[in-house]
Amino acid sequence: MSKFLLNRCIRDLSPLTVLKDNLQQTAKPILNYYAKNAASRGIKVLFISYETLEKEAPEGIDCFLYATSWEKVKSLKELYEHISSWRTQGKQHIVMIDTINPILNTSISSFTMFFGSVLALGSICFLTSFHKDVTLENYPSYLPPCEVFLDFTSTCTVSLIGMQHLSVEHDAKMRSLPNPLLEELQDDKIISLLGSNCETAIVLHVEFRKKSGRIIKESCVLKNGKLEPYTPFEETARGPEPADNQIDFNVSFNLNVSEKERKERDKVFLPYFSAQMVGSQHKSSFVDEGTIIYHADEADDFDEEEDADEDLLI
């Protein structure tokens, strides 16, 4: 039994698996991995292309179909007829679509009918990629964002990020610096960042939705065509904070407080504490917050006949 969730999705034919890619990381290495894994299991693979040339298709596929041509774009009905005629009874099948964006841009109702009709044939599943950077002009505004829509429609979603970009983000975080990838992407002149579309090491964040609705999450690394466990970057551990009596401020005088001085300091009762106590005990009192109450001592000698401005007279 496979220990990776992605391999289980291939073995059990997860109905709809969506690979979320962008300009910084393409999903082609995962499509190649799926095709090789399916071929080793004896699963037939049909590759439907909207933007991929036949010579660039993954190795191990059984059939290649162009969904577009110079004259027209094949309708979903034509694709369904081709899939139903290609399907072999008693075999397992995977239909790969290099991008689902054109289908989502036509009609959402047609999208659901197409996938539902094909899945009803039995022993078949879909694997497709969704370009997050591509804007869908005809996507209905009353529906949730397309990525959210696919999260609830698909049974398995895979988010991709290159290991090199992940390392750069981690280094910036450890140095308390802003993410350099986001800063560079804000520049309109930069289309693709250095280290984009990595093929040697890709981090996959897999989310599988069971029939009960519960989501199972897993992270792994596709490294040189093989899946490996993913170990997150560890943050630098901070050392223990020194005690008060161990702090060295590198000054010529002593800043530490002795035990006797600390006890005498605790006995000091400042006037504004009385104002807070009076204000809390008598809410209707005239005392406002911040008012300082002063009680005269016996040593205070006030002369009512004394003129305070007498010393100012010349």
Swiss-Prot record:
Q: Which UniProt keywords apply?
A: Cytoplasm, Nucleus, tRNA processing
Q: What is this protein called?
A: Elongator complex protein 5
Name its cellular compartments: Cytoplasm; Nucleus
- Pathway participation: tRNA modification; 5-methoxycarbonylmethyl-2-thiouridine-tRNA biosynthesis
Write out the function statement from the record.
Answer: Component of the elongator complex, a multiprotein complex which is required for multiple tRNA modifications, including mcm5U (5-methoxycarbonylmethyl uridine), mcm5s2U (5-methoxycarbonylmethyl-2-thiouridine), and ncm5U (5-carbamoylmethyl uridine). The elongator complex catalyzes formation of carboxymethyluridine in the wobble base at position 34 in tRNAs.
Q: Where is the signal peptide?
A: none
Q: How does it assemble?
A: Component of the elongator complex.
Q: What family name appears in the similarity comment?
A: Belongs to the ELP5 family.
Tell me the InterPro entries matching this sequence.
Elp5 (IPR019519), P-loop_NTPase (IPR027417)
According to its UniProt record, where is this protein mainly located?
cytoplasm
Q: Which Gene3D superfamilies match?
A: P-loop containing nucleotide triphosphate hydrolases
Q: Read off the PANTHER family from this record.
A: ELONGATOR COMPLEX PROTEIN 5
Organism expressing this protein natively: Schizosaccharomyces pombe (strain 972 / ATCC 24843)
Question: What are the GO BP annotations of this UniProt entry?
Answer: tRNA modification; tRNA wobble uridine modification
* Taxonomic path: Eukaryota, Fungi, Dikarya, Ascomycota, Taphrinomycotina
Under the cellular component aspect of Gene Ontology, which terms does the record hold? cytosol; elongator holoenzyme complex; nucleus
Lineage, top-rank taxon, reads Eukaryota
